[in-house]
C-alpha cells in the first residue's frame, strides 16, 4: 500500500472533509481519514488541497487529524463468493463485519469483500502454450449449484499461457495462471480481479435488445415489456408498491443473476428480502433464490455519502457477471435517494444548485449509470453474449412526476411503469397505470413473442389497450348519466374492460400461483377475454341484451383463470374458450 500522500484535515462539513498537504493525490483515490482511518474518496483537487467524500459517519473528527492516501481508486473485488453475499455501499460484507464487531458497524473497519481463506474447486479450460486474449475463460468454479463462475483473463492482458493450475482447490489469492505478453512480461492471474467502480467494464460491442426479460407479471410482460439489456423506471408515490414490484422482479425475472441495491430505503425492506429469498424457490432451477442474488444494502440509517457509491458498486458487480455471458438484472431501490445524496454532497461543496437544489450534473450522472445497462458481445474469443438490465425505482415527493429526478430518468430509460396511488387505494396491484405507462421495446420483442408464444400476440395486446382507453373515455359519461343510458355495445366495452383490469392486470404477489404467470398462460388468458368480447359483440348484434350476457357463469371461470396452476393452464383455459362458444350459442338460439 503506497502511503506517499499524507495531509491533515482543515475543514469538516458533514460527510465532506477538506485536507491540505495532499500533493500527488489522484481524483477518486481512496483515503483513510482521521485517527480512526475512515474510508473516503477524493472528489476535488485544488493545488495541495483535496476534498474528500467520507463514506462513514464523521462525528468526532477534528481539524488537524491526519489523512493518508492509499494510492488506489475506489474499487470492488470481483471473484467467486459474491453470490448470496450482502454488502454495504462500499462492498464490505455485513455478515463478516457482524462476526468481528457485533451488530453495529464500527467506523474505520476494513474487511475484505471476498473470503481469503475459503477454497474453491477450480477446473482449467486452457492448456499451457495456448494463446489467450482479454476476457478468455481460463477455468471455471462452481460458485453455486447452477452458476458456474468463469475465471477470465483480466482486461488489458493477453498473450501465451505459460502456467495453468491443475484441477484442485484454491483460494481467491492463489495464482491459477501465468500469461506472458508480447513484450515478454509475465502476468500472474488469480481468481480475483479488482475494478474501479466508476469505470464501466469493457466489451466488444453492444447488441440490439431483442429478447424480453420475462418477469411473470402480466401488466409488464404483455403490456409494457422490458428487453434483456434494457432500462426501466418505476416512479410512484409512497405506498403505491414500488418495493414490492422491485422484489417481484428480483424474484421472478428470468435473469441468471440478480443484483438488488437498497439505496437509502428502509432497513426492514432489505430484511424482508433477506428473509424471503432463501425460502423462495427459483421456478427455473428449483433452488433458493438467494443463490443467484447479490445484495447491496445501504439503508436510510447508513451514512449518506456511501449511497452515492453503492449504485456504482452494484453495477460493477453486475457487469462482471455479464462478462461471463450471463443475463443480469439490477434493481436499484431507490435512485431518488441516490440523487438526494448527490444533492447533499453538492451543497457541502458549495456548488451552484440547479433545479430544486439538485446539482446541475444530475442528468449526466443518471445517464452514466443507466448507460452501463445493455446487451453486449463480451470480451474473449468465444463471443459470449451477456446483458445487464437496469430497473430503477424513483420516489418523487408527493408522487409529483414533474420533479427533476423523474424527468431526467424518463429522458434516459425506455420503459416507464407509472405507479398510481389511486389504483393502490382501490387495492389494484400492481398499481401500474396503463394509460400513463409506456414501453419503447414493443417492436424489438414482438418477434420473440410471435415465434415463441403466439403469432397474434401484438394484435391482442393492442386491442386490449384500445379497450382500456375507450373505457377511460366512457367513464366521464357514466359518471354523469350512469351506465344504463349507454348503448348496449358500449356497456359491453365497459364489461370487457373490467375483465381486463380485474382478471388480467390485477395480480396477487402473495398468492402461490398468481405471483408468477408464465408468458404462455398470459397469452391464453388475454386471448380468452378477447374471444369472450368477440362472441358477446356477435350476440349483441343479434339482439341479446347485455344483462343476459352478464348472467353467464363462464364469466366466473374467466375470473378464476389466474389461479389455475401454471402446468394445467393451457388445457383448462382452452376448455373455458369452448365453454364460451357453447354458452353464447345457447343464448343466441334463445334470443332468436
UniProtKB/Swiss-Prot annotation:
Main EC class the enzyme belongs to: translocase
UniProt-recorded Gene Ontology molecular function terms: ATP binding; ATP hydrolysis activity; proton-transporting ATP synthase activity, rotational mechanism; proton-transporting ATPase activity, rotational mechanism
GO cellular component terms attached to this protein's record: plasma membrane; proton-transporting V-type ATPase, V1 domain
Keywords: ATP synthesis, ATP-binding, Cell membrane, Hydrogen ion transport, Ion transport, Membrane, Nucleotide-binding, Translocase, Transport
Record field: catalytic activity: ATP + H2O + 4 H(+)(in) = ADP + phosphate + 5 H(+)(out)
UniProt binding sites for ATP: 236-243
GO biological process: proton motive force-driven plasma membrane ATP synthesis
Species of origin: Methanopyrus kandleri (strain AV19 / DSM 6324 / JCM 9639 / NBRC 100938)
EC id: 7.1.2.2
Claim: NADP is one of the keywords in the record: no
Name by which UniProt lists this protein: A-type ATP synthase subunit A
Localisation per UniProt entry: Cell membrane
Pfam family, one: ATP-synt_ab
Subunit structure: Has multiple subunits with at least A(3), B(3), C, D, E, F, H, I and proteolipid K(x).
Family: Belongs to the ATPase alpha/beta chains family.
